[in-house]
Design a protein with these regions (language model features):
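A glycine-rich helix N-cap at a beta->alpha junction
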Residues: 68-88
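Active-site-adjacent substrate-binding region
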Residues: 99-101, 105-184, 190-195
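Active-site loop ensemble at the mouth of alpha/beta enzyme cores that anchors a bound cofactor
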Residues: 74, 91-106
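Alpha-helix C-terminal capping segments
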Residues: 39-43, 70-72, 150-155
Length: 197
C-alpha cells in the first residue's frame, strides 16, 4: 500500500560559516552535547555523579523521562535541548527572542514547568563568571523532559538549557557551532561547581 520514502538529508557546514545544517537536531544536539560534557568532565575533579539519558516519547507525553527519573532518582535535572530560534526571514526585529550565535538559551518557563529559581540563578552567575553569552526564552506551546523529571519524588530542581536551532521538526535544522561550544563550556562549569549535597 504505497512506497516508503525518507528525506534525503545530509550534513552541511553553511558556506564557510560556523552554522551547521543537519537532520533531526531535536534532540541529537542534546545527546551529542552530553557526550562532549562527559568527555570534558572525566579529567576535572568534581563531587557529582552525572547521568545522561537519551529518552523516547518526549513529544507524546514525556514517557521516557518519567521512567528515567524513577530509575536514577536524580537530585537535580539539567535538560539539554534545542531552543527554537526566531531569527528567521519575515519576522520583525522586535519579534526575535532567540537568535543563532547569541549563546545558549535558558528557558524561564515552558508549558510543562517553570525552571527552578535557584538553579536558574546559579547558571546565570556561572555564565557571567565564565563570560558566556546567554539568551532567555519562554515556550508556552510545548515542554521538555524536565517537565516530567521535576515532579519526581518530593520534587527535583530542574532547568532547560537549549541550543538555538532553526526549523526544528523539519528535514533540515540549522544551528551555530558557537552556541554549541558555549553550552558545553557553561554546563561543564555548572556541573563542576555544583556541590555533592
Amino acid at each position: 500500500p504505497g512506497d516508503p520514502i525518507i528525506p534525503d538529508t545530509t550534513f552541511h557546514v553553511l558556506n564557510g560559516t560556523r552554522m551547521i545544517m543537519a537532520k533531526a537536531l531535536d534532540d541529537r544536539l542534546g545527546c551529542c552535547l552530553f557526550i562532549d560534557i562527559i568527555k570534558a568532565l572525566q579529567d576535572i575533579p568534581h563531587p557529582n555523579t552525572v547521568y545522561g539519558v537519551g529518552t523516547v516519547q518526549e513529544e507524546v507525553g514525556l514517557r521516557g523521562a518519567t521512567t528515567a527519573a524513577n530509575v536514577i532518582e536524580p537530585d537535580i535535572c539539567l535538560t539539554v535541548e534545542v531552543a527554537i530560534a526566531t531569527d528567521v526571514p519575515g519576522l520583525e526585529k522586535e519579534d526575535v527572542e532567540v537568535k543563532l550565535g547569541g549563546g545558549p538559551v535558558l528557558t524561564l518557563a515552558d508549558a510543562s514547568m517553570i525552571g527552578n529559581r535557584n538553579l536558574r540563578s546559579f547558571i546565570i552567575e556561572t555564565a557571567k563568571k565564565e563570560n558566556i553569552p546567554l539568551q532567555f526564552n519562554t515556550m508556552m506551546g510545548g515542554g521538555t523532559d524536565g517537565g516530567a523529571i521535576h515532579k519526581f519524588g518530593p520534587g527535583v530542581p530542574a532547568v532547560v538549557l537549549g541550543i538555538p536551532t532553526r526549523y526544528i521538526h523539519s528535514h533540515y535544522g540549522v544551528f551555530h557551532y558557537d552556541d554549541y561550544e558555549n553550552a558545553l563550556k557553561l554546563l561543564v562549569s555548572v556541573i563542576k561547581d555544583l556541590d555533592a549535597g
